């Protein structure tokens, strides 16, 4: 197994304040939320080193499509358990210029002082759904092959926007 990771995530999140301030008063179902997040393909770093970074970037057509973008279409609140709030998210994921609908469970973790919240989740996608041919580095003479399925795991920390900023 090899994995790629990025520490650089951009975007915005607008969320109903009641979800963070008084989740016990929120009923299950759709909530008011907007979000868009992106990751620069070039910021993804492989566990296997720079050679695999280049292979991955080429497979993802990084020069033509430099960003991976997720746009939230719907967020449905399921339940709150202490500082953890559980949701189902639906949206569009664009990779290599190809957009697909995705849905996955999301957990929101509130800090005690409510200054920051963390969204985390996991979903699976197939490279071929985004017209990406799973890379097989030529230096390995076909000995290394990558499967089609990819597990996307994310953790996105957001802070409250201060008034006037």
Regions found by a protein language model. Name each.
Residues 1-165:
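Low-complexity, acidic/polar, glycine-enriched regions of mature
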């Amino acid at each position: 197994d090899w994995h790629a990771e990025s520490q650089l995530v951009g975007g915005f999140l607008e969320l109903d304040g009641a979800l963070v301030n008084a989740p016990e008063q929120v009923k299950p179902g759709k909530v008011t939320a907007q979000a868009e997040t992106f990751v620069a393909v070039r910021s993804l770093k492989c566990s296997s080193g720079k050679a695999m970074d280049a292979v991955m970037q080429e497979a993802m057509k990084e020069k033509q499509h430099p960003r991976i973008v997720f746009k939230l279409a719907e967020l449905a609140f399921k339940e709150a358990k202490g500082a953890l709030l559980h949701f189902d998210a639906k949206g569009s994921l664009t990779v290599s210029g190809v957009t697909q609908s995705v849905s996955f469970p999301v957990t929101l973790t509130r800090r005690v002082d409510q200054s920051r919240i963390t969204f985390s989740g996991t979903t699976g996608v197939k490279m071929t759904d985004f017209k990406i041919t799973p890379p097989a580095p030529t230096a390995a003479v076909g000995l290394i092959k990558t499967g089609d399925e990819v597990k996307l795991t994310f953790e996105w920390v957001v802070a409250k926007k201060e008034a006037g900023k």
